[in-house]
């Protein structure tokens, strides 16, 4: 079995590669990654010498490079993690999101048509559903929830999902899609809420919280997410969408306060900044379908997962300190410096 994992040097993609190489040592895993700001080759250092792993630096929008890889490796399965994924960046510069999230997906679809595969899996997001009101805790996103996007990022992800399903219906490509809630865990790029707060708190820097911090997210430990995708690509029904949620709804401000408590830092570090444009209020996923059909359930409670995550960042400071000392620092100042 040969699997191409696009975006495999990023947060979720790298964790998926670790999971697959450990669980299926006989599989050949190919990582295709452009190595943008969020793709860090040092993340994959532990598997670089594995004879069943190969890294290829290329852009999924580069049709020639993608076709060449398909010709060389004859993959059975494609798992597409490659995407620009930060909402704030999509608001500042939406153009690059169109390129990677839609054009890149189209190139992969065409490669699958041309060379043939047994499964193409698109990793998507619950953000394609829009948001839910804070005063309706009884409401959850299901696979039947209409697409109702709020940001350029979620719009382009939704467009990619629709494209994947169109290729399934038109050309018969064997596809599946998963839509997950907010992930957290090791190797999470420090522009996202949890790693950003951990890094800033450790440096006794301000902890920027949008608005009043009352926005609610459902948190999914990245290892649980990887196990769900593993199940879908092996046992999921072709042409289906599967929601993957963690049953861990938390307000942003409560997460930040919890991180302060775990690190022994004062809540006075919390700084409220101007809210994000079009900030979604609440995300909450109903994962009943994947549980009933594939037997998946999240294993990690947030209280345990956040402790493991903080421990990882404490033990791997060089990984994230190297990141925030470079180009990311310029972006950080742009986003939070004058708020």
Placement of each model-derived feature along the sequence:
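N-terminal Rossmann-like NAD(P)+-binding domain of SDR-like oxidoreductases, especially those catalyzing
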Residues: 1-183, 308, 313-316, 322, ...
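C-terminal substrate-binding subdomain of Rossmann-fold SDR/epimerase-dehydratase oxidoreductases
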Residues: 3, 19, 29, 58, ...
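Residues that form or flank phosphate/diphosphate-binding pockets in enzymes
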Residues: 12, 38-39, 64, 188, ...
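Short histidine/acidic/glycine/proline-rich micro-motifs that form metal-
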Residues: 35, 182-185, 215-216, 276-277
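Short aromatic-enriched loop/helix-cap "lid" or pocket-rim segments at secondary-structure transitions
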Residues: 41-44, 132-135, 188-191, 255-256, ...
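A glycine/serine/threonine-rich, flexible loop-to-helix segment
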Residues: 47, 135-136, 190-198, 274
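The catalytic Tyr-centered alpha-helix of NAD(P)H-dependent dehydrogenases
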Residues: 137, 149-156, 186, 190-194, ...
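Hydrophobic alpha-helix immediately C-terminal to the catalytic Tyr-X-X-X-Lys motif of short-chain
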Residues: 159, 163, 167, 197, ...
């Amino acid at each position: 079995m040969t699997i191409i994992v696009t975006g495999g040097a990023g947060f979720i993609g790298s964790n998926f590669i670790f999971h697959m190489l450990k669980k299926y040592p006989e599989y050949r895993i190919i990582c295709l990654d452009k190595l943008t700001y969020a793709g860090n080759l040092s993340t994959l250092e532990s598997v670089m010498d594995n004879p069943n792993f190969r890294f290829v630096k290329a852009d999924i929008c580069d049709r020639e490079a993608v076709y060449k890889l398909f010709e060389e490796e004859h993959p059975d399965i494609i798992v597409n993690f490659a995407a620009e994924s930060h909402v704030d960046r999509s608001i500042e510069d939406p153009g690059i999101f169109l390129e990677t999230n839609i054009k890149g997906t189209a190139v992969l679809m065409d490669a699958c048509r041309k060379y043939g595969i047994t499964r193409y899996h698109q990793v998507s997001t619950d953000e394609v559903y829009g948001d839910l009101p804070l005063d309706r805790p009884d409401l959850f996103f299901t696979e039947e929830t209409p697409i109702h996007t709020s940001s350029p990022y979620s719009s382009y992800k939704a467009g990619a999902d629709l494209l994947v399903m169109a290729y399934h219906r038109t050309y018969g490509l064997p596809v599946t899609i998963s839509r997950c809630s907010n992930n957290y865990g090791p190797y999470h790029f420090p522009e996202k809420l949890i790693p950003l707060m951990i890094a800033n708190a450790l440096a006794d820097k301000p902890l920027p919280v949008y608005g009043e911090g009352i926005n609610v997210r459902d948190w999914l430990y990245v290892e649980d997410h990887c196990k769900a995708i593993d199940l879908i690509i092996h046992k999921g029904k072709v042409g289906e969408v599967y929601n993957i949620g963690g049953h861990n709804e938390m307000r942003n401000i409560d997460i930040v306060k919890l991180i302060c408590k775990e690190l022994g830092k004062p809540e006075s570090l919390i700084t409220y900044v101007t809210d994000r444009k079009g900030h979604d209020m609440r995300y909450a996923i109903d994962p009943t379908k994947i549980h009933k059909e594939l037997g998946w359930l999240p294993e990690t409670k947030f209280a345990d997962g956040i402790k493991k995550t903080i421990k990882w960042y404490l033990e791997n400071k060089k990984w994230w300190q190297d990141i925030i000392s470079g180009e990311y620092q310029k972006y950080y100042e742009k986003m939070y410096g004058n708020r």
